[in-house]
């Protein structure tokens, strides 16, 4: 083999490699372009391609299983399938960003500021939800107090009735209406 044919094979293999195809898909459909970062981290540098391949393979396996499961359930679930694909891609993308940040900064101290902003936004949203839940809890306690205040102080004697229909005492039945004694 000559060196020109060997280099042309290398060029062909490089153009058909998974990372090149993946970068082309990201650039074509999502308009994202990211230059690969050159680092010299030793062991982490050697493990990075393997971890990325494992991430991609698991992404594709989960994507295949999810699409098959949704398709098997009903052919009309295209919207659910698209939602699943988008969600899975976002999870993959988030994992890739975290891994790239780890490669760029092995100490892990400086993740992106945008993630911190999202963290603060989600914390603010959690605080709002917590306040709403506390308000609902207080209203429920007030309603319980009103109900207890409205109940009569004396209880009826239902021991002579086979089935108790009043709310003041327990039914003599061993089971509720939802379960069977068998």
Curated annotation (Swiss-Prot):
It is found in: Membrane. Its main location: membrane. The keyword Kinase does not apply. GO terms for cellular component: membrane; nucleus. The keyword Phosphoprotein does not apply. Keywords: Coiled coil, Membrane, Transmembrane, Transmembrane helix. The chain crosses the membrane at residues 51-71. It comes from the Eukaryota. It is a single-pass membrane protein. Residues 124-151 form a coiled coil. PANTHER family: TRANSMEMBRANE AND COILED-COIL DOMAIN-CONTAINING PROTEIN 2. This is Transmembrane and coiled-coil domain-containing protein 2. It comes from Homo sapiens (Human).
């Amino acid at each position: 083999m000559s060196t020109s044919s060997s280099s042309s094979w290398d060029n062909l293999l490089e153009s058909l490699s998974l990372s090149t195809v993946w970068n082309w898909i990201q650039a074509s459909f999502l308009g994202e372009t990211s230059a690969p970062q050159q680092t010299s981290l030793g062991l982490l540098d050697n493990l990075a391609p393997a971890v990325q391949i494992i991430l991609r393979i698991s992404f594709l396996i989960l994507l295949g299983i999810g699409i098959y499961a949704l398709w098997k359930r009903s052919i009309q679930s295209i919207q659910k399938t698209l939602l699943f694909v988008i969600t899975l891609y976002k999870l993959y993308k988030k994992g890739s960003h975290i891994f790239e940040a780890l490669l760029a900064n092995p100490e892990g101290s400086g993740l992106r500021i945008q993630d911190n902003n999202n963290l603060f936004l989600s914390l603010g949203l959690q605080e709002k939800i917590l306040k709403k839940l506390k308000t609902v809890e207080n209203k429920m306690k007030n309603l319980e107090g009103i109900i207890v205040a409205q109940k009569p102080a004396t209880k009826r004697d239902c021991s002579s009735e086979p089935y108790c229909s009043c709310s003041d005492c327990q039914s003599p039945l061993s089971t509720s209406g939802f379960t069977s004694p068998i």
